[in-house]
Amino acid sequence: MMTKHERTYTTKANFMLHGGDYNPDQWLDRPDILADDIKLMKLSHTNTFSVGIFAWSALEPEEGVYNFEWLDKVIDDIYSIDGRVILATPSGARPAWMSQKYPEVLRVNASRVKQLHGGRHNHCFTSEVYRDKTQQINRLLAERYGNHPALLMWHISNEYSGECHCDKCQHAFRSWLREKYNDDLKALNDAWWGPFWSHTFSDWSQIESPSPYGESMVHGLNLDWRRFVTDQTISFFENEIVPIKELTPNIPITTNFMADTHELIPFQALDYSKFAKHLDVISWDAYPAWHNDWESTADLAMRVGFIDDLYRSLKQQPFLLMESTPSAVNWHPVNKAKRPGMHLLASMQMVAHGSDSVLYFQWRKSRGSSEKFHGAVVDHDNSSENRVFQEVAKVGQTLEKLSDVVGTNRPADVAILYDWESNWAINDAQGFGLETKRYPQTLVQHYRTFWEQDIPVDVITKEKDFSAYKLLIVPMLYLVSEETIARLKSFVAGGGTLVMTYISGLVNEHDLTYMGGWHNDLQEIFGMKPLETDTLYPKDKNYVKYRNQSYELKDYATVLELNTANVEGHYEDDFYANTPALTSHKFENGQAFYIGGRLEDQFHRDFYQELINQLSLEPVVAVKHGRGVSVQVRQASEKDFIFVMNFTEEKQPVAFESLVTDLITGEEINGELTLEKYEVRIVEKTK
């Protein structure tokens, strides 16, 4: 949690970055197009471009034969219009000559089939050849451009993902295991519960990565493999940046994180909490499916806010929106265009939650291949007059007036704990409901009340300092180590308020269950223990009575055994009717609540409202508004920057309690104003 309002600049720029992925290597035979790009950059009010992301074959068309002249001109031309460059390393897609000459760089899938050259992100992270080749090209880039005044940041590779199961990776995995378990095979067998199905190993060489044609049922193995994949990816990244850190130590480094699935949950395949420690700046690629047919615009905006707050909290500093689309993408099931006004609103939401940039994929639509219809600033018409280009220019004009916002953050008294390892483990668990676990979505459900009331939230990982917060919410923390339990206990003992839910605290860091049903320290904190969890069919319902109101329950209901806890709510139906569903417990100087079932949104609003009142949790700036309007604040020592955003399809009245000034128009506002559909107003308030 921030306690002061010092600015943290992600780069040496003191302005909002606006631009995106620029692929001039696709147009080297069209100098007229490249000349048009520079003209259009000025017209679109863009200032920063990520260059070279997939340009390896243009930089090194044959092994040891380099062509940097085109990149020299591109960077010089961008700088000539006072633009800046985020220079990428090209490891995300290697040239064909390399795959042909060095087949060891090709990835092997879990079925042990070696992939052909093609696509992207299909390399072996362990391959010494690929690591050497990557360092070579990166060194040349750093030597040539490290002192160029346009260079703002390094963009290392692109959207790291995937895994390899080749012989080299098997050897690396076994070495990783030997280090983790101190070369003690018995310790590994114990951690993986080896006697199950006679899966005790007698030699390290017998261990293979999970495979549909081999082992997939040993959950300790699966969990350690995912940890290894994260560590090996980070190792590859660290190898990439050796020459860059050596030659350009003052240029910040990032790589672009992602979201997952159409529901925009945190990317699941890599533990970003580990990866974040190796980056100077967090950046991520955001592609919400605006105007979809399964949720309201406000509900989607809330989910965007959650993942923004997670990625911002990874380093407790502003992040960068590295990729977004000016309108439609090309890979959603339905690629709907952003409606007029939505692009500005969506972009300003990212800034409101902590981004110091609005960057796009892509600057110009490619003419061929799979991304030729992906949204871009410049369409195939090469025009500055179409709707999308004009909306991009409006975003740029707005960002030009937000330089004072750059580097600011905001404090939070509320934290929600998100854990990648627990997500892996619960998804692997053969129990509960296979389709209804929905761990990330459950955290968003608990986030809702605070987002609706404009109360800042940090979405933190288990390594963070819990004592910085008044309220810590820990939904569905299936996997929890004794170390984390001890820190939760210390948090409550020190005066904190802890909320935990069903399917929490069931296994340790090896995915082994705690004997006795629940860890003794958890029983002490909560004054009760869970006895069994009832998993409901999709059409099943139960109800919980809380404060004389009935709330619908779906999916899960946990039967609880009281010790010293108080009953705050009870089940109304089934064999556990009239038994505790919600408990509270005073523990030393703090308090702990346990929610036994998955309850409707209105329950969370009412339950958390009591805690909001009790703990004096408040918005940074009070603005009166209805549901569907979000107010987010970024704070400097002398001013608050207030983003008031209408995520509804109707006009919405809002009211300020004190005088504010519109940052874009300079208008002074004292009292009420009306937001149009999808409108955003950005105001400042002097402290």
Give, region by region, the residue ranges found by the protein language model.
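Aromatic-lined substrate-binding rim segments of carbohydrate-active enzymes
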Residues: 35-43, 50-113, 240-247
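The substrate-binding groove and active-site-proximal loops of carbohydrate-active enzymes
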Residues: 18-28, 54-69, 116-133, 157-164, ...
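Conserved, mostly hydrophobic/aromatic
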Residues: 20, 41, 49, 78, ...
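Short, well-ordered coil/turn segments that N-cap beta-strands
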Residues: 14-18, 45-47, 79-85, 147-152, ...
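N-terminal carbohydrate-binding accessory modules
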Residues: 1-48, 61, 76, 84, ...
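Short, acidic/polar
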Residues: 27-42, 136, 264-275, 339-347
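Carbohydrate-binding surfaces of carbohydrate-active enzymes
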Residues: 207, 280, 284-687
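Polysaccharide-binding and catalytic clefts of secreted carbohydrate-active enzymes
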Residues: 99-101, 111-306
